[in-house]
Amino acid sequence: GLWNKIKEAASKAAGKAALGFVNEMV
């Protein structure tokens, strides 16, 4: 459903942001 797509997109965005943050810290 639409809600699952929104949650999936948010999860991917959060994952990318977390990876980017980790890369900046290293």
Curated annotation (Swiss-Prot):
Gene Ontology CC terms, in alphabetical order: extracellular region
GO BP term, example: defense response to bacterium
Domain of life, per lineage: Eukaryota
Residues recorded with modification Valine amide: 26
Free-text tissue specificity from the UniProt record: Expressed by the skin glands.
Pfam families xref list: DD_K (PF12121)
Keywords annotated in UniProt: Amidation, Amphibian defense peptide, Antibiotic, Antimicrobial, Secreted
Compartment(s) where it occurs, according to its Swiss-Prot or TrEMBL record: Secreted
Family designation: Belongs to the frog skin active peptide (FSAP) family. Dermaseptin subfamily.
Function field: Possesses a potent antimicrobial activity against Gram-positive and Gram-negative bacteria. Probably acts by disturbing membrane functions with its amphipathic structure.
Protein name: Dermaseptin-B5
The species this protein was found in: Phyllomedusa bicolor (Two-colored leaf frog)
